[in-house]
Amino acid sequence: MSDSASPIFVEYRNTDLLLSPSSAHVYYLPVSSDKHIMLTASTTMGAVPLTTSTTPLVSSTVHQTVFRLRFDSAVTRLTPVTTTTSVTTGTLPWYIYQTPLVEIINTTRVTIGAPYDCDGFFWGRELRPNPDISGVGVVFAFMLSAWLVWLITVYAFARGQIDASQVTSADTRFFRVQVKSSGWRWSSVFLRAILVFSDQQLVTGIAIMIATFASCQDISVWHYAFAVSLAWVSHQHYCSLKTQHCVLD
């Protein structure tokens, strides 16, 4: 199999074959958004020699098929050709072309421009970042306020710096919470801190929802689902805070 005289077979499965309008025997294999491989063949079932060209890609027909290529041992590398941007109006946009899935049958001496991975299953436009919805600052603001509220609550219960009216029999029996005499003073301080962080998260959630609905036509489904998740976190935080107010009242 490693002999240099052995032929090389490369198989493209479920590949978009772009048929050239000028010749029925010229095919283009798209490799990326700006590269392609041009093939010439008398039939799609026999031996197919490889040729490259810088001719602008103007295609009118797309074929889905399994395309097997046979190369001589002298071929050691297949290099995609960069195409020009003179694609005529009305042709399919570049971003819907699927990257070929390449399978080497009996040798690994050939390197195809398309990698042997799952890139061929990614259809549609590339996902662009949206810092207004899923930026580092937005996520950090949400997580920071949530963790600070949790740490303040745990510290208050562990140190007994809470109001006696907030301690239940379950807290005393299972968690052995002991309320100190000066707990009511620190309890008001901790409660105000929790209110500040909760208000911050609520305002941030409202701002994210406004930004999401303002750009609803341009954002991706993933960013919309991410914004809905952040809004759910803000809603749950607000409901927990209102429950605490009802208990205190």
Swiss-Prot record:
Transmembrane portions of the chain: 138-158
Residues with attached carbohydrate: N106
Protein's UniProt keywords contain Cell wall biogenesis/degradation: no
Membrane topology category: Single-pass membrane protein
UniProt KW Transmembrane keyword: yes
Annotated compartments: Membrane
Function: Part of the gene cluster that mediates the biosynthesis of elsinochromes, pigments consisting of at least four interconvertible tautomers (A, B, C and D) that have a core phenolic quinone to which various side chains are attached and which play an important role in fungal pathogenesis. The non-reducing polyketide synthase PKS1 was proposed to iteratively catalyze decarboxylation between acetyl-CoA and malonyl-CoA subunits for polyketide chain elongation.
Protein name: Elsinochromes biosynthesis cluster protein HP3
Organismal lineage: Eukaryota, Fungi, Dikarya, Ascomycota, Pezizomycotina
